[in-house]
UniProtKB/Swiss-Prot annotation:
E.C. numbers: 6.3.2.1
Protein name, entry field: Pantothenate synthetase
Gene Ontology terms: cellular component: cytosol
Taxonomic placement: Bacteria, Pseudomonadati, Pseudomonadota, Alphaproteobacteria, Hyphomicrobiales
Disulfide bridge map: none
Source organism of the structure: Brucella abortus (strain 2308)
Coiled-coil regions, chain positions: none
């Protein structure tokens, strides 16, 4: 595996693969890799000739009071995992490599980016869309892989690619979970043992939402209230966002009527904000399927 730190070096390294018509699979990450990231890598390796992973903690997507400074970083550890996973290239630029001067160009996708998580984190998804579009311009991948745990991000990236006619296939990969159901996340490392035990309430709340919906609870406000009450049984968990939305448009739904719905949860356990999502209903929506841009 070749580790690359600059944009020019990466472009030079990928040039032979392009000349030979090889397919490039790209997995953008912020590092501190876990089983979910490695599943994205596995899919990329299976479906492409060349696999490239980026590790970049993007300051544009962090608010003033968020965890940019303490976000877990261990490039040596991550490089070892990617080497074992038979990745071809690791792109690990610095902030000055990616943003040599203050950015004046911003990619935003309202109203998708202003809803759900965007309501609590203004500007977050503009930062995500900006860095992902820049990475796509640098890498020029044939396919890029994103986890469905960050479902809103996946919807936004798909829309950005469609709107901007970026020639990359966006592949959503099912959420990878720990044995007890907690979604794999780099931020899980923040949890104390007691908090880690309490965090299981998050996937359990999604199970409860699925059960209630299938049993006939068709009012979105009632379903949100029931989920909030369920999470409230765990004193260490504070529900910050409970959203019932259309899984393609992220719009609020006046009535559910048995259709597929997105249940999005943001739950704070201690100082750690945990994110999880699930699409429930009678059929999977189109947005969770792979499609070409």
């Amino acid at each position: 595996m070749q580790i690359i730190h600059t944009i020019e070096e990466l472009r030079q390294a990928l040039a032979p693969a392009r000349q030979q018509g090889k397919k490039i699979g790209f997995v953008p990450t912020m590092g501190y890799l876990h089983k979910g990231h490695l599943e994205l890598v596995r899919r990329a390796r299976v479906e492409n000739d060349v696999t490239l992973v980026s590790i970049f903690v993007n300051p544009l997507q962090f608010g003033a009071n968020e965890d940019l400074g303490r976000y877990p970083r261990d490039l040596e550890r991550d490089a070892g995992l990617l080497h074992d996973a038979q990745v071809d290239y690791l792109f690990a630029p610095t902030v000055s490599d990616m943003y040599p001067r203050p950015m004046q160009t911003v990619v935003d996708v309202p109203p998708l980016g202003n809803q759900i998580e965007g309501e609590a984190r203004p500007g977050h998804f503009a930062g995500v869309a900006t860095v992902v579009s820049k990475l796509f311009n640098i890498v020029g991948p044939d396919a890029a892989y994103f986890g469905e745990k960050d479902f809103q991000q996946l919807v936004i990236i798909r829309r950005m690619v469609d709107d901007m006619a970026i020639p990359v296939r966006i592949v959503g990969v099912e959420t990878v979970r720990e044995d007890d159901g907690l979604a794999c996340s780099s931020r899980n490392v923040y949890l104390t043992p007691e908090q880690r035990r309490a965090a299981i309430i998050v996937p359990q709340a999604l199970d409860e939402a699925d059960r209630l919906y299938r049993s006939g609870m068709d009012d979105p406000d009632a379903l949100e209230a029931a989920i909030r009450t369920f999470i409230g049984r765990q004193p260490l968990a504070v529900p910050e966002v409970i959203a019932i939305r259309d899984p393609e448009t992220l719009e609020r739904l006046p009535a559910l009527q048995g259709r597929p719905i997105l249940v999005a949860l943001f739950v704070r356990v201690g100082a750690t904000r945990l994110l999880d999502n699930r699409v429930i209903g009678h059929a999977a929506p189109q947005i969770t399927q792979e499609r070409a841009a």
